[in-house]
Amino acid sequence: MKNEIILITGASGCVGQYIANWLMENSSSELFLWVRDPKKITSINLKSPRVKVLVGDLRQPNKFKKELSEVNRVIHTATAWGDPKRTKEVNIDAVKNLLDLLNPSNVKQIIYFSTASILDRNLNLLPEAFKYGTEYIQTKAQCLTELESHNYQQKSSLFSQH
């Protein structure tokens, strides 16, 4: 049986590296690590036959069309903030484009990392996130809305951090 392929976006960040390390130690999955700068990955053996580094911008997913069609699970930790245009492009548009390139018959799970600032105490989306939140919070709320209406809705999980 072929090992599962797990895509981790933002794999050079703190959360992405932690997840990749955990998976290397606790699974036999192959990891596709999507990063802009592989030099920022300091805690993962990039020479492992189980690791494939995808170097590129999340806003240009067609570069990895073949790899994305093979993915079984997505752990989406990549994010942007600060520049409103880039924040929207990365946090909303790039996610939609990435989802469109996945092969629905292969995908078992999508884990979306976000912020607790978009949820109420019952884990429902806060309408205020759209109205009063920073562009970062607004784009995270919009992306969650998109995920909830996407074909992958039943396969998606939200992980929010404080």
For each feature predicted by the language model, list its residue ranges:
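Conserved glycine-rich Rossmann-like NAD(P)H-binding loop of the short-chain dehydrogenase/reductase
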Residues: 27-39
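Conserved Rossmann-like nucleotide-binding pocket used by diverse enzymes
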Residues: 7, 32, 54
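Conserved Rossmann-fold NAD(P)-dependent oxidoreductase catalytic core, especially the SDR/UDP-sugar
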Residues: 93-139, 157
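Conserved beta-loop-beta element that borders a ligand/cofactor-binding pocket
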Residues: 146-162
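Structural motif
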Residues: 5, 72-73, 109
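NAD(P)H-binding glycine-rich loop region in Rossmannoid oxidoreductase-like domains
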Residues: 47-97, 101, 119-127
